[in-house]
Structure formats: C-alpha cells, structure tokens
C-alpha cells in the first residue's frame, strides 16, 4: 500500500495545529503568527516523501534521514555476536519515518523500556527506550534498532515476527528527535563516515 506524503501519525496533530491557527487568526489576528509557525513546523516534521532504494543487491540502505554519529565494531547485544554498528541520529527537522535497510524476514522483535537521554550520545543505544528488529536476509543477519531520544517519547513499529520486509519498506515511525542503530556482520563494508548526512530509503550505509 502506498503511503501518503504526510505520515498518518501526524494527521491528528496537524488537524489540531492548523485548527488552532485558524481560530487564533479569527480571534487575535496577527498575534496568531506563533500558531502558524507551529503548524508549519508540524507539517514539515510529518512529511513522508516516497523514496526509491538503489538497485545494488549488496547494499544496506539507511533506515532513516539524519546524520551518521557512529561507525564502529561492537558487540551486538541482540544476537550476541561481533558486529559493525552504524548509527543515524535524527533531529527534529528530519523525516522520521523508518525504513527497512534490507530485504528479509523478521525473526525476532525486542522492546526495551528505558530513559530518554539525548539520542546523539552513544549511551542512548543502551539506556534509552528502544525497539529492535532482527531481519534475516539472504546476505546476512541485520538488526535495526529504533531508539527514543530526548524529545521523542513514542516509538511506533508496525511489523511483527514472521513478516517479510522489502528494502526501503516503511515499518515504523519515531516522533521528534531520535536515533536508529544498524548492526551488521563484521564482513560488511561501511560506505559512510561519521558526520555524513544520509537519506532514509536511499543512501547506502554499507555493502555485504
């Protein structure tokens, strides 16, 4: 099913924001400008443009828009293995729709409650509320972890164990600033560097 260009998660928020702005304009005229600023901000936040993933079969694509904050070899706490971890930090101006980095079947899903420290920090990976998916692809096991941030306090995930995902397929949403960690086999080769801006569903993070 094709997703609307404005994420469904934001429809009620936008209805309230623009409704309040219109009422404020009618009641207080030019003093309603802050209401309109908030409404426009909400509109850009909940945008969800269609993306066409690259055709490269060996590519692992970014699950989110944002900035690379980590590229390192670590211990994957979900599959108890050594792994290459690539982390994408999303600020409040990024698209917050989350997309599958690979084609594959969901073998497990783990939800962990936690705190809400700044998602730009490494400790967010282990301390914050998070939702992890183990995606088994033909080229290797991938774990994608949605992590709540300082402002984001709601992780939405619409898939379950046994579902199949296509690379670039939308599977979740995190409201406001947050982070996604991707754990890959150590044989994967990173294609991004720290500080690089990436586009969800389009930028290649690594190759198998």
Curated annotation (Swiss-Prot):
Q: Name one GO biological process term.
A: phosphatidylethanolamine biosynthetic process
List the keywords (alphabetical): Cell membrane, Decarboxylase, Lipid biosynthesis, Lipid metabolism, Lyase, Membrane, Phospholipid biosynthesis, Phospholipid metabolism, Pyruvate, Zymogen
PTM comment: the record says:
Is synthesized initially as an inactive proenzyme. Formation of the active enzyme involves a self-maturation process in which the active site pyruvoyl group is generated from an internal serine residue via an autocatalytic post-translational modification. Two non-identical subunits are generated from the proenzyme in this reaction, and the pyruvate is formed at the N-terminus of the alpha chain, which is derived from the carboxyl end of the proenzyme.
Where is it predominantly found?
membrane
The record places the site described as Cleavage (non-hydrolytic) at: 177-178
Please name the Pfam families in this protein's record.
PS_Dcarbxylase
Question: Pathway, according to UniProt?
Answer: Phospholipid metabolism; phosphatidylethanolamine biosynthesis; phosphatidylethanolamine from CDP-diacylglycerol: step 2/2
Its localization reads: Cell membrane
Which cofactor(s) are needed, names only?
pyruvate
Q: Which InterPro entries match?
A: PS_Dcarbxylase, PSD-A
- List GO terms (cellular component aspect): plasma membrane
GO molecular function, one example? phosphatidylserine decarboxylase activity
| Positions where Pyruvic acid (Ser) occurs in the chain | 178
Q: What is its EC number?
A: 4.1.1.65
Q: Which reaction is this enzyme known to catalyze?
A: a 1,2-diacyl-sn-glycero-3-phospho-L-serine + H(+) = a 1,2-diacyl-sn-glycero-3-phosphoethanolamine + CO2
* Active site (catalytic residues): 178 (schiff-base intermediate with substrate)
In the record's cofactor note, how is the cofactor described as bound?
Binds 1 pyruvoyl group covalently per subunit.
**How does the record classify its membrane topology?**
Peripheral membrane protein
| Function statement | Catalyzes the formation of phosphatidylethanolamine (PtdEtn) from phosphatidylserine (PtdSer).
Q: Which PANTHER family match?
A: ARCHAETIDYLSERINE DECARBOXYLASE PROENZYME-RELATED
Q: Which family does the record assign?
A: Belongs to the phosphatidylserine decarboxylase family. PSD-A subfamily.
Q: How does it assemble?
A: Heterodimer of a large membrane-associated beta subunit and a small pyruvoyl-containing alpha subunit.
Which named protein is this?
Phosphatidylserine decarboxylase proenzyme
Please name the gene that encodes this protein.
psd
